[in-house]
């Protein structure tokens, strides 16, 4: 088929002699031969079916593998790579001819070619002028997307003087009119009108990409470059995506510089020379002016694909991913390793040590962050309400307790993570900003940290230092996982399906064990309820721990590689994470009942004043338990949430809900309203450490002898011992209440004291110790009655205010257990 370029016929009619590009025409012929002759591994013509697809109205781009091209003709591949921008129109003509041979293609339809699988990838920093015009592959993170516009690629103009049509005037990234009317009699050079019906337009979109943190040299500012997408490539990436762009680097006039406010963007008047030489010099900029001759580099992309889709690109959260599709993406050796990991009995611990090999201790935090990476299962109700599956974690702790290290580790490991500091971030920087485009002067949305971390993790350090108005901005993102913007005429709801890992310092710099969690952190109740897990790190002076940490740090400084003890490599963990995340575990009936039972326990404990939680228990904590259980099931590659998964989820949740550190109990506070409220921090866990700075030995409960000299020291009991005595008394009173004899169902205070002293008589060695023990148990019962309201004194006779009131205040009242009190395990 004899193809004649329409622009050539137009130029011939205008009497202009065009020089033939023989190299490009030869490339066109060879490329068409490649399309018609290249066969795949199955022996079929590889690109024939793709060409037949181009008949569909929405398709106009043929995707070609560069590896196939190199295999077919190395010289052709090299020429295309080096002279891509020059030969690109000719390659498109070859595609058009190839498509016409294999289908009924409309005459005026434009076709394009796109290349994939380019062998080398360049950084944005490496885009310099020597690379202009060659075929490149660059990678970066999309930070801003513009709306899709129609772009004029080939214009048909009407001469306003003689009504002649000038067809196929090629547009070079700016509005270009014909240089002269093609009618030999007419000398019109300026008065033309565009005929939009006969001109050709193509979809056009501009995006801005930026260097990723991993590619950035230390201390450098991230470079960014504008990318132009056309035809099928438009809308193929969203803000926050990490993508590879294949295309060429080109130079375009910088319109924003040329049309600076207050300066006319017209050709500046020149001092005329001899007649006929006034326009000599710069040509083709008539519409823009030559004031500054400002140009800029942009990247013209013909193909966009997610960076590393196997482990961490857009496919990480794809709904249609199955175990089979992931298995097909792995090599046999990789798949065997994933299978071996799934059979590991000690997988939970091994994954934690592999993820954070340089952080000593803090095992609970490691487990919580690991479950956050696996995540729960997102769901949608019948009404269309979305329930998030992502887990939010907050780490609160003293300075130098490795909070920021956890965040940095997650940022480096997670395929799509953004690290930001709370104090240096504004509401717009975290969510999304509306900015004015410098060229079109339209408002466009620029992605913030939460949008950039969509389908990933957003690490926010110094979370407590954020201004309140900035904290409020992420309320919606943390629960609904969307960001709503209504400003500058732009109304949009954007996705922010991200897990938030926050680190915060306590108020005053040190965690005060005598206060609840809420009093220790500068966070509002709505924000606190949106976190699934809270972890408290306290910098304790412990000789064993201090030695171990110092040893680990010195090892890291002296022998960096040898001291890192990993069971699995990071790549193996990433592969396993990707495989495990495609499981959608269902909750079994047994697990469902267990979850409900545990939630009831949390609510009842929160309701009773005795064991107040660190913050209010709401339905969000129930959802947190479900998400954590699903994360545990995913980690073990299970299709069903089992009670053991719920048990671990409840244990982690319990750790964060109840105050971890509890102060000593002051038994001498008689009718004083002290700030200290130990009942807020009661923890039934066996993990609670013995009280610190106490005057009572926490192991056997012996009281130290106190001097009678003023001022008299207050009698203090460590919290674990206080709790043990309290539980003993409650169990004894409940036992008496449950007896069905006709005896009394309550016990007098003196009888209870005698029973307790008899129980511990083996521990009492002297009369003095017996007196001390009796004093302690008397004070404990007084506190259980008047402060904790665990025990109730029964009034035998008369009502309050009657003549028998004095009898009610007897020294030896009957005691019963408060019916609302829940005895913890």
From Swiss-Prot:
Chain segments carrying region Disordered: 668-690
Where it sits in the cell: the answer is:
Nucleus
Signal peptide span per the entry?
none
Acidic residues compositional bias: what residue ranges? 668-679
Membrane spanning residue stretches: none
Q: Which UniProt keywords apply?
A: ATP-binding, Cell cycle, DNA replication, DNA-binding, Helicase, Hydrolase, Metal-binding, Nucleotide-binding, Nucleus, Zinc, Zinc-finger
Subunit structure and binding partners: Component of the mcm2-7 complex (RLF-M). The complex forms a toroidal hexameric ring with the proposed subunit order mcm2-mcm6-mcm4-mcm7-mcm3-mcm5 (By simililarity). Begins to associate with zmcm3, mcm4 and mcm7 into mcm complexes at the neurula stage.
Instruction: Classify the main location.
Output: nucleus
The molecule here is called Zygotic DNA replication licensing factor mcm6-B
Q: Where does ATP bind?
A: 397-404
InterPro entries recorded:
MCM (IPR031327), MCM6 (IPR008049), Mcm6_C (IPR041024), MCM_CS (IPR018525), MCM_dom (IPR001208), MCM_lid (IPR041562), MCM_N (IPR027925), MCM_OB (IPR033762)
Which reactions are catalysed by this chain? ATP + H2O = ADP + phosphate + H(+)
One Pfam family, short name: MCM_lid
| Zinc fingers (C4-type), renumbered ranges | 159-186
Q: Which SUPFAM superfamilies match?
A: Nucleic acid-binding proteins, P-loop containing nucleoside triphosphate hydrolases
- Role this protein plays: Acts as a component of the mcm2-7 complex (mcm complex) which is the putative replicative helicase essential for 'once per cell cycle' DNA replication initiation and elongation in eukaryotic cells. The active ATPase sites in the mcm2-7 ring are formed through the interaction surfaces of two neighboring subunits such that a critical structure of a conserved arginine finger motif is provided in trans relative to the ATP-binding site of the Walker A box of the adjacent subunit. The six ATPase active sites, however, are likely to contribute differentially to the complex helicase activity.
Give yes or no: UniProt keyword Nucleus. Answer: yes
- EC number(s) given by UniProt: 3.6.4.12
GO biological process annotation, one example: double-strand break repair via break-induced replication
């Amino acid at each position: 088929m004899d193809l004649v370029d329409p622009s050539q016929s137009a130029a011939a009619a205008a009497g202009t002699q065009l020089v033939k590009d023989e190299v490009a025409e030869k490339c066109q012929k060879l490329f068409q031969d490649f399309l018609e002759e290249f066969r795949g591994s199955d022996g079929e013509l590889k690109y024939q079916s793709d060409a037949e697809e181009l008949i569909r109205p929405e398709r106009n781009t043929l995707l070609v593998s560069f590896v196939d091209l190199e295999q077919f003709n190395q010289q052709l591949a090299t020429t295309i790579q080096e002279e891509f921008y020059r030969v690109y129109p000719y390659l498109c003509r070859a595609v058009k001819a190839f498509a016409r041979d294999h289908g009924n293609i409309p005459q005026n339809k434009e076709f394009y070619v796109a290349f994939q699988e380019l062998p080398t990838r360049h950084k944005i920093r490496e885009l310099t002028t020597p690379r202009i015009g060659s075929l490149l592959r660059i990678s970066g993170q999309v930070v801003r997307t513009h709306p899709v516009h129609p772009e004029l690629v080939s214009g048909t103009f009407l001469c306003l003087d003689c009504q002649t049509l000038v067809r196929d005037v090629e547009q070079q990234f700016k509005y270009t009119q014909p240089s002269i009317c093609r009618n030999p009699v007419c000398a019109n050079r300026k008065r033309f009108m565009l005929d939009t019906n006969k001109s050709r337009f193509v979809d056009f979109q501009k995006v801005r990409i930026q260097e990723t943190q991993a590619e950035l040299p230390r201390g450098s500012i991230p470079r960014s470059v504008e990318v132009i997408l056309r035809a099928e490539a438009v809308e193929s990436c969203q803000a926050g995506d990490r993508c590879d762009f294949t295309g060429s680097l080109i130079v375009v006039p910088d319109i924003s510089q040329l049309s600076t406010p207050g300066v006319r963007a017209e050709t500046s008047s020149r001092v005329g020379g001899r007649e006929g030489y006034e326009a000599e010099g710069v040509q083709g900029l008539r519409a823009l002016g030559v004031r500054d001759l400002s140009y800029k580099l942009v990247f013209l992309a013909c193909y966009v694909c997610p960076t590393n889709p196997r482990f961490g690109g857009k496919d990480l959260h794809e709904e249609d991913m199955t175990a089979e599709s992931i298995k097909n993406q792995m090599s046999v050796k990789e798949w065997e390793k994933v299978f071996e990991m799934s059979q590991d009995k000690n997988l939970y611990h091994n994954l934690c040590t592999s993820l954070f090999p340089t952080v000593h201790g803090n095992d609970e935090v490691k487990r919580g962050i690991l479950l956050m990476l696996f995540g729960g299962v997102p769901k949608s109700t019948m009404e269309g309400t979305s329930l998030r599956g992502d887990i939010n974690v907050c780490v609160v702790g003293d300075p130098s307790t490795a909070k920021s290290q956890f965040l940095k580790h997650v940022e480096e490991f997670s395929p799509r993570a953004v690290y930001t500091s709370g104090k240096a971030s504004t509401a717009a920087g975290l969510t999304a900003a509306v900015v004015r485009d410098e060229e079109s002067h339209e408002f466009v949305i620029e992605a913030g940290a939460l949008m950039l971390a969509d389908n990933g993790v957003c690490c926010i350090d110094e979370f407590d230092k954020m201004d309140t108005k900035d904290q409020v901005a992420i309320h919606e993102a943390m629960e609904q996982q969307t960001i709503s913007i209504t400003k500058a005429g732009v109304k949009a709801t954007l996705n922010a399906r991200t897990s938030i890992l926050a680190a915060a310092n306590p108020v005053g710099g040190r965690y005060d064990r005598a206060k609840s969690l809420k009093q220790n952190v500068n966070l509002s109740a709505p924000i606190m309820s949106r976190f699934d897990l809270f972890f408290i790190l306290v910098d304790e002076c412990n000789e064993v721990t201090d030695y171990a940490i110092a040893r680990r740090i010195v090892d890291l400084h002296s022998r960096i590689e040898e001291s890192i003890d990993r069971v699995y490599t990071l790549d193996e963990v990433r592969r396993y994470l990707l495989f495990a995340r495609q499981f959608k575990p269902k909750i079994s009936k047994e697990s469902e009942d267990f979850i409900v039972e545990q939630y009831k326990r949390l609510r009842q404990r929160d309701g009773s004043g005795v064991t107040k939680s660190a913050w209010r228990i709401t339905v969000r904590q129930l959802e947190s338990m479900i998400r954590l259980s699903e994360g545990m099931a995913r980690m073990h590659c299970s299709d069903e949430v089992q009670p053991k998964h719920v048990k671990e989820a409840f244990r982690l949740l319990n750790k964060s809900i109840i105050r971890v550190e509890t102060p000593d109990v002051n038994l001498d506070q008689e009718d004083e309203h002290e700030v200290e409220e130990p009942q807020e921090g009661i923890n039934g866990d066996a993990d609670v450490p013995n009280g610190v700075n106490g005057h009572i030995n926490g192991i056997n409960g012996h009281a130290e002898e106190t001097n009678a000299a003023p001022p008299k020291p207050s009698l203090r009991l460590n919290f674990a011992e206080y709790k043990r005595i309290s539980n003993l008394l409650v169990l004894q009173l409940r036992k008496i209440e449950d007896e069905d004899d006709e005896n009394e169902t309550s016990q007098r205070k003196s009888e209870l004291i005698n029973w307790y002293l008899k129980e511990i008589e083996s521990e009492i060695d002297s009369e003095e110790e017996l007196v001390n023990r009796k004093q302690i148990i008397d004070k404990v019962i007084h506190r259980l009655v008047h402060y904790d309201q665990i025990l109730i004194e029964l009034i035998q006779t008369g009502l309050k205010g009657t003549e028998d009131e004095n009898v009610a205040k007897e020294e030896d009242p009957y005691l019963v257990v408060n019916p609302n009190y829940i005895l913890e395990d």
